[in-house]
Amino acid sequence: TLFKHNLVEIRPEKKEAIFINLDTQQELVQPYDMIHVTPPMGPPDFIKNSPLADSAGWVDVNKSTLQHNKYQNVFGLGDASSLPTSKTGAAIRKQAPVLVKNLLSLMKGEALTASYDGYTSCPLVTGYDSLILAEFDYDLNPQETFPFDQSKERYSMFLLKKYVLPPLYWHGMLRGRA
């Protein structure tokens, strides 16, 4: 992992990744065996340039209630929010019920009692048929779903990622069923 570096080129024939240091603008050539690239993430301009945004441009929400820190009738979650956790489908799956419960409570004039703990999940592919399913909260405490040690590589977790999670996402989560 290279922090404060931007990937600008990949030379697959040489197995080299070219990065620019964001502080010094110096080029770094990094050899690799396998490379996993995450595109740069940032808030959309219509949020970044609005009064809803925090200093970094994300929707400024309370990390537990998901309610905006200035406008009480605004809530935020997922990729546009300032939540200090990974922007993953697993995270938003746990954020959505908290947001709904707290929004309904606000509409009824009740206290916001639902709380998001920062849960997120990161399936780490470790081989052609193995995976570690890392699940954790804001404090990086394990939040394992299954009754076994998920810090170990498992074929079953690979099968879950390959065959179960895609339909769960497309036919469950996106339709509010999971």
Residue spans of the language-model regions?
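A conserved FAD-binding loop/helix module that cradles the flavin
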Residues: 77-126, 133-135
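FAD-binding beta-loop-beta segment adjacent to the flavin cofactor pocket
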Residues: 57-75, 126-146
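Glycine-rich beta-alpha junction loops
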Residues: 7, 34-42, 120, 126-130
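A conserved short coil-to-beta-strand element within the FAD-binding core of flavoproteins
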Residues: 3-16
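A structured beta-alpha segment of the ubiquitous adenosine-cofactor-binding alpha/beta core
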Residues: 20-28
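Rossmann-like dinucleotide-binding cores of NAD(P)H-dependent redox enzymes
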Residues: 1-4, 110-112
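FAD-site-proximal beta/loop scaffold in flavoenzymes
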Residues: 31-94, 104-105
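C-terminal auxiliary extensions adjacent to catalytic cores
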Residues: 133-178
